[in-house]
């Protein structure tokens, strides 16, 4: 009897450990559970020209994305743009939320948070979240520090809590300096995997073209384009919860919080 009880105990522990450390889909019977997912993310917006073009393209493809927006671009008190531009930017953010995209925090002034005081970091993040929530009516759950370096992320993650700090995967298109669409598309298509988080910027025409072209190719390979929120929470059926003290860069092979290579 004792031996049988011991075997049952060991088996129960094995089940629990399997659930904790291996990627388990929410529903093994659903199509989504076997369809590869990737999260396209866009920093530094919104941009009244290119963000609109991107949103139009995403809508045509039934694709979802995550936008890490700069708070200053949404603030009528900001002196960096006209009131009309601010109005248009806010309308774009409202559209993002209405169309099912995730709107996330990318600081207020796009400053280097690693060189800022804790008080400055708190202001940058809190002010931006307030502006986003004022527009969307939704809580801001995710943030990405400008620059996205591992050191910066490590510095701000505890201050940012309960927001979850999100970086990106193992490669960087550096689309802010590269204007070669074909080169960037090839980089994305050749390196993307199920659970990847891709970084681009929605304030460059070439970046928008890159994103949409890459999606067209990846879609033929069976990929579904989801928000960071959906990607990181796809294992909630196993009791998985996000930890604000970690930095999330991929969902590859259950390695949810691996820091990106620098």
Model-based region annotation:
Residues 4-25:
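Sec-dependent N-terminal signal peptides of Gram-positive bacterial secreted proteins and lipoproteins
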Residues 149-191, 223-235:
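His/Asp/Glu-enriched short active-site or ligand-binding loop at hydrolase and phosphoryl-transfer sites
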